[in-house]
Amino acid sequence: MAPRASSPALSENEFDIFDALAGGDEAAQPMRVTADLGIDLEFGSDDGSDDEAFIAAKQAAANRKNANAPGKSGKKGGGFQAMGLNVALLKAIAQKGFKIPTPIQRKAVPLILQGDDVVGMARTGSGKTAAFVIPMIERLKTHSAKVGARGVIMSPSRELALQTLKVVKEFGRGTDLRTILLVGGDSLEEQFNSMTTNPDIIIATPGRFLHLKVEMGLDLSSVQYIVFDEADRLFEMGFAAQLAEILYALPTSRQTLLFSATLPKSLVEFARAGLQEPKLIRLDAESKISPDLKSAYFTIKSGDRDGALIHLLENVIKMPVGQTEVWKQAKEEADNLSKGKKRKRGSGNPKDAPVEESTIIFAATKHRVEYLSTLLKAAGYPVSYVYGNLDQTARQEQVKDFRAGLTRILVVTDVAARGYRHATHKPRHQLRLPFSTKNLCSSSGEDGPRWAEGLGIQPVQTCRSAISHRLTNVPWQTPSGCLAPYQLEPSVELVNKQLTDDEDLVNLLNVAEKGERQYQRTRNQASNQSVHRAKDLASDSKFAETHMLFNDEMHDALRAKEDMLERIQGFRPAETVFEIGKRGTNSEAAEIMRKRRVAVERQKTKQAFNKANDESSGLTRPTADALPDDELDSEDDQQAAVGDYESESDELEVTVSQPESKKSGKDVWRSDEFFMSYLPKENFAEEKAYGVQGGDAGNSNFVSAARSAEMSLVNDEIQGFADASKPRMRWDKKSKKYVSRANDEDGSKGAKMIRGESGQKIAASFRSGRFDDWRKANKVKMQRVGEMEAPNRSTQFNSGGPRYKHKAEKAPKQADRYRDDYHVQKQRVQEAKEKRIGHFKDGGAKNELKDVDTVRKERRVQEKRKEKNARPSKKRKF
């Protein structure tokens, strides 16, 4: 028999020969085997098997059909079918509308299915909820008859928990898994009842879940799968003690997952303590600035910063002054509705229309946000603002106005904007350069892939300018320079006039400057290498030239004027004030300056000589491109391991570049054709991040991976600036000893606290005895974990959805003065009248409305009285 033909390498579909064997329609058709099948059809003998040729032909036809399918590209990516999910779950995923997994799902789902602990960094809207819900349903599969919850999902807020519950129900549509919701604000008795129905999945907030655990004495030894969703928000909201207590009660064999938008230091420490050999999932593409984002850097003076902002909005972004068209249309429709006019047909919803000039301005502190929003409103721009401790309702209203197009500008702090999904597809403007490259990538590149064309504008101060050289995917060829003074002066004068006329604006500016000084003292400082690069950059004459974006607008006369002003600004007199007019005299001050000048000249000569020797020997100062990993002395320096300007394959990057000036004696030993750098190219890191097989090879060491991904943001208000230098202990007069200041912050000061199983302090009110009273009143017996489920408990299951209650309101009976509780009952009746309950709904007064019969009867009585009393009156005698 002839040897078997090799299987087609490009095949992804299994071949079904049932129709051919059963004599179907396709079997009756003659076979047409073409010469170019893409496979090996040489069987070695003339009497080869017809079945093998038939299978090969059908397989080749299937390959051609898949290759020629419309909308398919040559590069094939694995879908949900390649992850080994069950049929019911795949059907639910298809009904949900998911076809291709997102990058975070492509990397996280296989690792979670393997049983590894995972720390995933993903922004809101990246599909992270499905990334941990799909493996959870695949692992739990069906409802277990044994008592005990097997999956727990922790959410920071009630709204996010409800959203997660909806996703779990949609993906678990084909299973009988029981899911309950435990959040604050709901009835404890109803949640007691839900916990006795043996749920498989618990979606809860940490505070309420810990309350039920302590109150009911829950045994969590059956938990196999726990997820901390939005883990950074959990720590920010003060749930660290609750999470530690919950984690201590879980078995060691559990699988723990953390998903977060950022990775603060506290979260890294929690992951190291609570997770076993975790794998960090972080796509390098999310730490890059989008190639669709055009960047421009402007050097400005501190005093001209606000004027430069007005100038950029007016002349670069071309933002009009006044209310938006969407706002005018919405106001017109509101006026028409108030006048009783109908809405015009086909006008559409004006709140759905985007604004072309949508701009986002990032600031450091909330005081700066308040000042900028007030300044821009005074300049005539519609502005929304968001900062950290803004009320949730006010924050939603501000963001809603910006998304609806009622405002053109959103002023926001870095803390409030973290993980926030921007709905705009137009440029965003950034007022200040952040303190780290990670923060800049998070703020500037968060929604880059969704932009048709973006514009990032960063006014740069000299001490922070070198940070941009360390950015991945942003070469140093990005243009930089100062603004044209003749265009900047009117905007600066406008800001000065506003400050002169508005006293409140001056007060806001003073508070903002004080807060910014506090921010400068508490933020992370730049490394020594960054300081050296900043000094080298500041000494470059091109750094102070007019930006190339404004060169076309400058005429020859204006350019000559600017050049003259630049020369005047850079003028250095040959003599100091101590030497003027004192030549030839024996002045002590002049003699000191002459000696000082000799020492300075000697030092300059030595530096120039050393620099010339370094260039002649091919040695230069270590920069971001040639610095070894062990010499990178800050978190910004550690990110330089992914190449900078050496990546030549990034052809899709959209930047406004300027030609480099060739410096003699620098990098002359490096050949573009033969030189091989030890640094990995940029596309290598991108392909490694998106890879499915072997994608976790670089994340085997969580400590080193988390060190590069860690990002702790400085608070945006003054109260949080001094936390780093705040004393950790205080003297307690009552106990006569030093105690931790955490006692003042966790609620234990002046309140009763108890120690949990993990040693953490929890509120004593968690153990109030309400569950024991409820259990006795309802005669419910709690089953132990591991026992078989009682058959009568399944009928009482509630998934945490709405429960229907009667809404009957009964008013109390009238008070009886002969009873002992007369005064108490009278008070209840009075309260019912005030609240209009029951038959007091229309008020407690007597109903004075008369019916027709009563009115008719009263009229007849009045007529009879008139007839009877119609006799003339007696005359009075005086």
Swiss-Prot record:
Record domain Helicase C-terminal: where: 349-538
Listed InterPro entries: DBP10_C, DDX54/DBP10_DEAD-box_helicase, DEAD/DEAH_box_helicase_dom, DEAD_box_RNA_helicase, Helicase_ATP-bd, Helicase_C-like, P-loop_NTPase, RNA-helicase_DEAD-box_CS
Region (Disordered): 332-354, 517-536, 601-666, 726-758, 787-878
Biased composition (Polar residues): 521-531, 606-620
The entry's keywords: ATP-binding, Helicase, Hydrolase, Nucleotide-binding, Nucleus, Ribosome biogenesis, RNA-binding, rRNA processing
Catalytically driven reaction(s): ATP + H2O = ADP + phosphate + H(+)
Chain positions recorded as ATP binding sites: 122-129
One Gene Ontology cellular component: nucleolus
Helicase ATP-binding domain span: 109-281
Enzyme class: hydrolase
Motif (Q motif): 78-106
DEAD box, short sequence motif: residues: 229-232
Major subcellular location class: nucleus
Keyword Cell wall biogenesis/degradation: no
Pfam families (alphabetical): DBP10CT, DEAD, Helicase_C
Subcellular location: Nucleus, Nucleolus
Positions with biased composition (Basic and acidic residues): 809-870
Acidic residues bias: start-end ranges: 627-638
Disulfide bonds: none
Gene Ontology BP, a term: rRNA processing
GO molecular function terms listed in the Swiss-Prot or TrEMBL record: ATP binding; ATP hydrolysis activity; RNA binding; RNA helicase activity
Similarity comment: family membership: Belongs to the DEAD box helicase family. DDX54/DBP10 subfamily.
Comment field on protein domains: The Q motif is unique to and characteristic of the DEAD box family of RNA helicases and controls ATP binding and hydrolysis.
Protein's job: ATP-binding RNA helicase involved in the biogenesis of 60S ribosomal subunits and is required for the normal formation of 25S and 5.8S rRNAs.
Protein's UniProt name: ATP-dependent RNA helicase DBP10
Gene: DBP10
